[in-house]
Amino acid sequence: MADQRIGADVSDFARAHMERFLSGDLPPAHIAMGIRPDLWVRSVSRGHLLAVWPNDGSRNIGSGRVFGGWVAGLSDNIVSLCMASALEEGEGFTTQDLQIKLFRPVDGPEIEIEAWLKNRSRTTGYVEADWRLPNGKLAAKVFAWKAIRPMEALTRST
């Protein structure tokens, strides 16, 4: 059954990729880090993603402060899923540059993370994301550049 969180404007190729992730079929690194797009993504359309991360305090480094490395790791996943929503048949990508700007401590029970594909050329995607606190204030801004390549160029040959 099709995942209702994925919009009709997502290509069949991208939809298959998104459905795998949103079903919980995750790479080992996601499992080890506790990154769960299958539980947190609320909606995906071509070039847009909305997630709500349930902050239970387990990623805090101090009272009311989420570890910046966690923000970066989850951000890379969010902007990558957003980029994946705009792929066409046979395309893949890898992160070229990821920048995180923290404006205030990330705290609160539910953090909204929204990502947008701002520009896509044949070889590069540029994605931005906002982390918003429960009060609506901007906690972090994410900037990511993705190198778009044929899938076979990104697969390791043995």
Model-derived segments and spans:
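Terminal targeting signals and extreme-terminal segments of soluble enzymes
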Residues: 1-158
